[in-house]
Amino acid sequence: MSSAKEQSSVTAALQPEQWTTSSNEALKLFVTNPEAALNFQPTFTYPIFGDAETIYGYKDLDIFLCFDHYTFKPFLNIKYSAKLTDDPEIIDIKKTIDEFLPKSTIFKDEVKWVDSIKEEKDNGYKIPGKLIDSFSENDKEYDIYKIDLKSDNGYELHQRLQILVLLFIEAGSFIDAKDELWNLYVLYEKDNKSTSNNEPSIVGFTTAYNYWKYPGAKKFDSTEQESRIKISQFIILPIYQGQGLGQLFYSHLFDKWLAQDDIIEVVVEDPNESFDDLRDRADLKRLNTSEQFDFKAVTPKVDKEWVEKTRRALKLEKRQFARLLEIILLYKLKHGYPGITKRDVRLFIKKRLYDKNKEGLATLDDNTKKDKLQTAYQALEDDYYRILGDLKLNIKRENDEEETDTVSKKQKV
């Protein structure tokens, strides 16, 4: 930048730390709306700036990446007080980031960015997709849109959003949005203020892939096609986190897929711990109200046919349904439900752990094998109780039901 000092790298050779900046700290993200610019920091920057997540050769470096709350049009600005000039390790920051941003990104000229956003809106910008669901939470209203990736505006919106995948999902990568099997769902917060222009704000998004499932020879010639939905990327902007919106977003999407006959299963690609937590709690709450799920059937001797039939009806993948059954068993154990013993629950969970790790355990002697299984079980039990927290499941004891029946009979007399 012309306003910054340019210095020879020889002068900095003995003090490289003064010219080295954490890229996680230098990159400052903003979402701007008519009232404020909301700031948040990235979790990762290594996909852009390398594994060390550092930038060498600049002093007092700040990288500003801003997005409009509605169109998500990006603005990039880079500021520093001094820059080294003759070191091959020094990167061109703008050129480096440009590889991950759409061509519509405005650089440095903030007035031009504001004018370009206004121009888009004046030309009738609308959310490029179909409204598929709505919900309310904490006196606010939210809409879920399925974005039309075949349209120019839909594809462009994805191009604007996708850099967040690199910044907030470990090992995240871009998808081929031109592949027709990819779907993009975006969550918006509606603006119902009488003094505003009623523009919604992007809260988060998820990408999901449709996998066609071979139905077997009997159904192969059928006109009905079955598919699996695989959730690939799932992001709630940090400025909206901590409000339960991710869980609601996931649950409302799952309910939509549950109602579609052509979708037979919903799976998740390499979920991290935070998404596992969100998913476990959301799925448990769905089971709480599902007419297809019988909590009484969940015992350490649960019928395998019931498990498979119920899992298919609920469109849950095997690993996830097994986790839910184990969590429910521990819930029953914790609350003293009859017929549930700690030993039986422990053996039930250990069996799945053993089957999952059979090859690795096969080379160990019996004592080591038992120790490994016990350690794995204890860690899982602790994690399940953490996930349960203060969640209340809709499970009635048999004596509770008998008491209810007695009261009902007395009322009829």
UniProtKB/Swiss-Prot annotation:
Q: What is its main location?
A: cytoplasm
The protein's Enzyme Commission number? 2.3.1.48
Per UniProt, the keywords (alphabetical) are:
Acyltransferase, Chromatin regulator, Cytoplasm, DNA damage, DNA repair, Nucleus, Transferase
What's the catalysed reaction? L-lysyl-[protein] + acetyl-CoA = N(6)-acetyl-L-lysyl-[protein] + CoA + H(+)
Ligand binding (acetyl-CoA): 234-236, 241-247
What Gene3D superfamilies has UniProt attached to this entry? 1.10.10.390, 3.40.630.30, Histone acetyl transferase 1 (HAT1), N-terminal domain (3.90.360.10)
Q: Name one GO cellular component term.
A: chromosome, telomeric region
- At what residues does the UniProt record annotate the site feature described as Interaction with histone H4 N-terminus? 182
Its GO biological process annotations read: cellular response to reactive oxygen species; DNA repair; DNA repair-dependent chromatin remodeling; double-strand break repair; negative regulation of pseudohyphal growth; phenotypic switching; subtelomeric heterochromatin formation
Q: Where is this region: Interaction with histone H4 N-terminus?
A: 51-53, 209-211
- InterPro entries named among the record's database cross-references: Acyl_CoA_acyltransferase, Hat1_N, Hat1_N_sf, Hist_AcTrfase_B-typ_cat-su, Hist_AcTrfase_HAT1_C
Q: Which residues form the active site?
A: 269 (proton donor/acceptor)
- What GO molecular function annotations does the UniProt record carry, in alphabetical order? chromatin binding; histone binding; histone H4 acetyltransferase activity; histone H4K12 acetyltransferase activity; histone H4K5 acetyltransferase activity
Query: Where is this protein found?
Result: Cytoplasm; Nucleus
- Protein purpose: Catalytic component of the histone acetylase B (HAT-B) complex. Acetylates 'Lys-14' of histone H4 which is required for telomeric silencing. Has intrinsic substrate specificity that modifies lysine in recognition sequence GXGKXG. Involved in DNA double-strand break repair.
Q: Which family does it belong to?
A: Belongs to the HAT1 family.
Q: How does it assemble?
A: Component of the HAT-B complex composed of at least HAT1 and HAT2. The HAT-B complex binds to histone H4 tail.
Q: What's the protein name?
A: Histone acetyltransferase type B catalytic subunit
